[in-house]
Every structure is written in C-alpha cells, then in structure tokens.
Regions:
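Active-site/ligand-binding loops adjacent to catalytic centers
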Residues: 130-149, 201-301, 345-377
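Small/polar-residue-rich loop-to-helix segments that shape phosphate-bearing ligand pockets
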Residues: 102-178, 244-269
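A glycine-rich, Thr/Ser-enriched phosphate-binding loop motif common to dinucleotide/cofactor-binding enzymes
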Residues: 50-66, 153-168, 303-307
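A short, small-residue-rich loop immediately preceding and capping a beta-strand
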Residues: 73-94, 98-106, 179-188, 215, ...
C-alpha cells in the first residue's frame, strides 16, 4: 500500500511504516495562468480535499520512510541526521511512529522556520548555536562516529535518493507517461538527482517511450551557488558563492547547503547535462509573488522552497523553454502547513544548544544524558 507498492525501492519488508505518497494532479488554475496545456503538479503535503495526507508537509517524509526501513532491514540500530528543517521533522515524526532511534542536528539560524509534530523532548535534537546547515552536517558526522549510530549519508545514500524518487514514480503512474520537463527548487541537489535516476530507470525498463525529462532547477538569490556555476558553464562552484553570510539573506534556509552534490560524478551538473536542463535564480520578491500566485490559482498554501520552483517555472515559460503541449511536472516539495496547523498541534523545535566546536568529551556527555533520559521513560 502507499509508496510500498513500488518494487523499485530498496526495501523488502516495510512493516510498521505505513506511508502514503504525493498527490499528482493535472493543474487547471496555474496552468491557465501560465498558458500551459499539460501542467501536472506533484503535491507533497497536507491537503485532505485532494487526498494529500503528509502531515510533515514535505516530500522529505518519503526519504525518511525509505531510509529508516532500509536501515532497519540491514541491522542498523539507529541513525544520526543533519537538517535545515524538513528532514529533521520527517525523521523525528517517523522515529516516534516506529520507535526507531535517531539523533538530529540542526542549526539555530533555521529554527524560526522549523516545527515538529512531536515535542522535541521525545527526539534527541542538537541545536548548533554558532553555525549553519553545513556546520550541522559536520557536527552530525562527529556525533555519528562517537555514538556508533551511522550518519544518514545525505545524497550519497541510495535509499534517500530512491525515497525522493517516489515523486517521479507517482507522477508517471498518474500521468501514464514520462513528463517532458521537471521543475524543482534545490539545496543539496538530492531530489533532482533522484528524479533523473528514476527517469533513467523508466527508460531502461522499456514500458515508457520518450526521452529523459529536462530538469529545470532553481535556487534562492543571493545564495545560489549551483545556479551561478551552471550559468557560467562551470562544473565547479565559486567559493565566493558559498559564503555563509549569503544564507542570512534568503527566505529559504532549507536550500542553504554549502555542500551540494553539484560537480561530483553523477551530481546536479551531470543531471542537467544529460537532460538538456537549466538552472534559475529566484529573488525573495519573486518567491513571494509565486507563492501568492500558486495559492490563488490552486487554493492551497505552499512553503517558500516550493514557491521558488513555481517562480522558476514562470521564468522557463517566459524564456520559451517548454514546447506547446509538452507535459510538465512541477514538484511542490512542501505545502499545506497553514491548513495542518489549523487542525493539529505542532511544536517549536528545541533541544540541547551546543557549539559547532563542541569537544568529543562534550558529545559523549550529551549522548550519555540522552541514553539516561530514554531509559527512564
């Protein structure tokens, strides 16, 4: 049932992890506004009227479900996860639902946009007071080495990529064909790489004719290192575009990875090259306008990162990048937060506040404290 009906996922027995997928539908309102005859929306979030019941309001829940199920099948006792927001919420939620232990590391600069479906006291959460998402990744790796709970692995984890690739699986299932274009906002690049890899599987499978969907990927200015590198025609990003100070200027902190999988083999650069794709850079103002446009046309709220994708779609249409009648898949990576919070209680994210320079002894002390609290419950 749910996403587990797809046998291309690296999970054999997902017991105890019921997981619904995205809702994929043919747009009318936004399609009409943009002049697209074949615009399909993959909505990942909470929209009961459409049958979308992802209470974490993010497609990262598919990642978490597949990663946890895969780790459990392979005898992994627990995981350490770094996040700028959505991944933390997804792993915290499924950890509580399944009893599978995770330790989560997040940067304090992202807390204003973060929330859990459960109180943070139930999920060991470490808050980096003096760093960004990339610092959280570094600290999470150290927690992993000391605790023996493997680091979730980021984009290198095939279970993560296959989990995010569920969007393409559901889309092709709903559309009955491959999309000609795929639109998404990117931070680490994992979701875009997942869409590319899953599309390649469809072509190798032979049941779906056509070509690889052209990837149209977007970032939020002024922190848009991949977009800027791509527009320059470079495989390598400019270190100046990865400056941490730029992150404070964007509305989408979840897109703020300074370690994106761009120039590595099989990364975003290769995905764009293989698909004849393009990258776009979207300002905060353009993001806000696109968010309002989507809500007006489709009657549901979306998160800022998804609005970046909507803005990029508008740019692609204006540039004539999409042929008349070509099927377009817009990945709304998160939405329905306002609706969910009207119906369900959510919690601000808190936890142990630590420095990015915490000592190994300090990490050991925190882990011991977490073990004691868990054993007393």
């Amino acid at each position: 049932r749910g996403v587990w009906r797809f046998n291309w996922l690296p999970v054999h027995s997902p017991r105890g992890i019921p997981q619904s997928g995205p809702v994929v539908y043919r747009s009318e309102g936004l399609a009409r506004r943009l002049g697209l005859r074949e615009l399909w929306v993959a909505f990942n979030g909470y929209w009961p009227e459409r049958g979308a019941l992802i209470e974490t309001c993010t497609f990262k829940e598919f990642e978490a479900a597949v990663v946890l199920a895969n780790a459990r099948e392979n005898g992994v006792a627990g995981l350490t996860v770094a996040s700028a927001g959505n991944t933390a919420r997804a792993f915290a939620h499924l950890s509580q639902k399944t009893g599978y232990p995770v330790t989560i590391v997040v940067p304090s600069m992202c807390l204003q946009d973060m929330w859990y479906l459960e109180t943070s006291s139930l999920v060991p959460t470490m808050v980096i007071e003096d760093g960004d998402y990339s610092d959280a990744i570094d600290v999470a790796r150290r927690f992993s080495l000391i605790s023996g709970m493997p680091f979730e692995g980021g984009v290198k984890n095939v279970a993560k990529r296959d989990g995010l690739g569920i969007v393409m699986l559901e889309a092709v299932s709903a559309m009955g064909r491959m999309p000609g274009h795929y639109v998404q906002a990117v931070g680490s690049g994992a979701g875009a790489i997942a869409a590319w890899e899953m599309s390649e599987r469809f072509l190798r499978d032979g049941r779906f004719d056509g070509r690889l969907p052209r990837l149209h990927l977007a970032q939020n200015l002024p922190f848009a290192p991949m977009s800027k590198a791509w527009q320059r025609g470079n495989r390598e990003m400019d270190p100046a575009d990865l400056e941490a100070s730029l992150i404070a200027c964007i509305s989408t902190r979840v897109l703020s990875s300074r370690y994106p999988a761009y120039g590595v083999r099989g990364g975003v650069y290769d995905a764009l090259t293989a698909t004849g794709g393009n990258m776009y850079a979207v300002t905060n103002e353009e993001m806000a306008e696109a968010r309002d446009l989507f809500e007006e046309c489709e009657e549901v709220d979306i998160v800022p990162a998804a609005a970046v994708a909507v803005a990029a779609l508008g740019k692609a249409v204006t540039q004539g990048a999409m042929g008349d009648g070509e099927p377009v898949l817009l990945n709304i990576t998160g939405g329905g937060e306002k609706r969910l919070k009207e119906q369900k209680k959510t919690y601000a994210v808190g936890g142990e506040r630590i420095s990015k320079d915490i000592s190994d002894a300090g990490i050991e002390e925190l882990l011991c404290g977490a073990l004691k609290r868990n054993s007393s419950r």
